[in-house]
Regions:
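Short hydrophobic/aromatic segments of transmembrane alpha-helices and their interfaces
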Residues: 19-20, 206
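C-terminal motif of bacterial Sec signal peptides marking the signal peptidase cleavage site
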Residues: 26-30
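Subset-of-secretome marker
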Residues: 3, 32-275
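Bacterial N-terminal signal peptides that target proteins for export
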Residues: 2-19
Length: 275
């Protein structure tokens, strides 16, 4: 039991389980734009295209660009990591601060093919006792030992930020001369709602049909950022959905950790994930 005098039992377990679910679902829904190629990483144009929407979709990563970095945030979380299409791998990290006790849980997952490893680190723990003591190495997980195997990440494609389905749901797209795009997205479209979060979209009501966005394409023709400015709705404050892609072809390649860098996950790791 973790406590600082007023603590609640199970805080870390609940937090770790929720964080794992966030890492597996937020910005990693594995959606694909309906009825269109999600992109080919083509050469950027210096003048507006005849079809800005299709030009923007063509900039969405499709796996031909090599390994690249990504980061993103939505209403509740921030993620960052690397995607390596050749390895069918992702390396992603998120950090969540406990609002009651003040410590931060930093959780990382590494997926290569069908295998998955996890790391957990706690910071800001002065004065706290009972935090789980886990190895500093990558801990390989057996999905069959998880209560919900789908709550941990899997490799489901390169567009981890779901830029494709969001852009596909755009009702207007305007291309600027500096490779910046602006427009409006109808988030009630099925795949777009899944990408951003169906509960969050439902809370917007009619405003979900008119959500402004901006996007930037790099000189190499690849998407570098997509930002949705989600309006306030009811008691919910306005928030932004941001996806950033960078270092196409130059990010580190992913591989299964070997030797002393990894070990089988201990029982305590499964207790954290299973809640």
């Amino acid at each position: 039991m973790m406590t600082n005098g007023t603590g609640r039992a199970g805080t870390v377990r609940r937090g770790a389980g929720a964080l794992a679910a966030v890492l597996a679902t937020t910005l990693l829904a594995g959606c694909g734009p309906a009825g269109t190629d999600s992109g080919s990483g083509g050469t950027a144009s210096t003048s507006p295209s005849a079809n800005p929407k299709q030009a923007l979709l063509a900039a969405v990563p499709d796996g031909s660009e090599g390994a690249f970095r990504f980061s993103g945030k939505d209403a509740t979380s921030d993620l960052s990591g690397v995607v390596d299409p050749a390895a069918k791998g992702i390396d992603l990290t998120a950090a969540v601060k406990d609002p009651e006790h003040g410590f931060t849980t930093r959780m990382s997952f590494l997926v290569v093919q069908e295998r998955i490893w996890m790391k957990v680190k706690f910071t800001g723990t002065d004065g706290l006792t009972g935090l789980p003591k886990l190895p500093n190495r990558w801990m390989e997980l057996d999905r069959s030992r998880l209560t919900d195997p789908d709550a941990t990440p899997t490799y489901e494609g390169v567009d981890v930020g779901n830029a494709g389905p969001i852009i596909q749901a755009a009702t207007t797209v305007e291309e600027k001369a500096d490779r910046t795009y602006a427009g409006v997205v109808d988030l009630t479209a099925a795949e777009a709602a899944k990408a951003v979060g169906e509960e969050e979209v439902a809370a917007l009501g009619d405003a979900a049909r008119q959500v402004p966005f901006t996007a930037v394409v790099g000189a190499d023709g690849n998407l570098t950022s997509l930002t949705l400015d989600v309006p306030a709705a009811g008691t919910a404050k306005a928030w932004t959905y941001v996806v950033k892609y960078a270092d196409y072809g130059s990010a580190p390649k992913l591989a299964a950790p070997g030797g002393d860098a990894a070990q089988p996950a201990p029982k305590l790791a499964y207790q954290m994930l299973n809640g």
